[in-house]
């Protein structure tokens, strides 16, 4: 039987994971960019989508209901939708604007919380096992002065702590919750970094295994492993995929 993955986001890591998962299974995409969601759905084939803002509790509830209406069940959830709020004023702690902090926490941390809450509600009601993978960041574990965005790092740290706490609670009923923590990845969100020659040079040394930024496909491959039954003994883990970031000066 094909397994159903509910995934948030429609570009970058989300798009790469959806394409890889849909080669053998079913995908339901949740995102706030209708055109991107539609294009990705058409590209991967075995997929459907619902346009929704993950910060909105009712929109999240409706999106999960739409997935259930379409496929009858949800086997796995990958929360990858997120933002960087640098353009809104995120930065070093003494410079970070409160509005930027609120925005990035709202999208990244609250959005992940709401999606987990809704899907876990379905699973616990139906006595169903399942797997959740949330998206953290290497910046929550191994900070770098050149990437000092306190709001973003804080939001990812919140996701990691929430995931581990929830994993402990739900493990006895067969629900697994893990985190994937990418290094710097070549996605639309990292466009500013991609355009900066100094950052590009720094990343050659910071992520020596990839000689720079990781690809979205690098993360998607590990994500699919963590979402499949192949990883069934794992829960409460933060799996770092960083091209060598954490072991490089």
Predicted features along the sequence, with ranges:
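Short C-terminal tail/terminal secondary-structure segment
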Residues: 84, 224, 235-249
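Canonical Rossmann dinucleotide-binding motif of NAD(H)/NADP(H)-dependent dehydrogenases/reductases
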Residues: 1-28
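Substrate-binding pocket helix/loop in short-chain dehydrogenase/reductase
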Residues: 88-93, 97-102, 203-204
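Catalytic loop of short-chain dehydrogenase/reductase
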Residues: 83-84, 133-158, 163-164, 168-172, ...
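Conserved glycine-rich Rossmann-like NAD(P)H-binding loop of the short-chain dehydrogenase/reductase
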Residues: 24-39
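Short, small/polar-rich loop/turn modules that mediate ligand/substrate recognition or access, typified
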Residues: 171, 176, 234-236
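Catalytic Tyr-x(3-8)-Lys segment
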Residues: 198-218
């Amino acid at each position: 039987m094909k397994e159903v993955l509910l995934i948030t986001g429609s570009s970058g890591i989300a798009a790469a994971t959806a394409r890889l998962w849909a080669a053998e299974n079913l995908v339901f995409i949740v995102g706030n960019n209708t055109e991107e969601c539609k294009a990705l759905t058409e590209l991967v084939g075995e997929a459907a989508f619902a346009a929704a803002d993950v910060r909105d509790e009712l929109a999240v509830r409706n999106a999960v209901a739409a997935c259930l209406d379409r496929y009858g069940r949800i086997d796995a959830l990958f929360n990858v939708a997120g933002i960087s709020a640098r353009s809104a004023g995120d930065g070093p702690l003494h410079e970070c604007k409160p509005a930027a902090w609120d925005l990035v926490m709202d999208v990244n941390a609250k959005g992940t919380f709401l999606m987990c809450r809704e899907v876990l509600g379905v699973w616990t009601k139906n006595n169903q096992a399942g797997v959740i993978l949330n998206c953290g960041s290497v910046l929550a574990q191994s900070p770098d002065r050149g990437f000092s965005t306190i709001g973003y790092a804080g939001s990812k740290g919140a996701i990691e702590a929430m995931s581990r706490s929830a994993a402990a609670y739900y493990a006895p009923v067969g629900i697994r919750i893990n985190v994937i923590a990418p290094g710097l990845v070549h996605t639309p969100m990292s466009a500013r970094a991609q355009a900066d020659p100094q950052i590009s040079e720094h990343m050659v040394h910071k992520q020596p295994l990839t000689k720079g930024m990781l690809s979205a496909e690098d993360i998607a491959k590990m994500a699919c492993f963590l979402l499949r039954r192949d990883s069934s003994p794992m829960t409460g883990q933060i799996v770092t995929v960083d091209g060598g970031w954490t072991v490089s000066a």
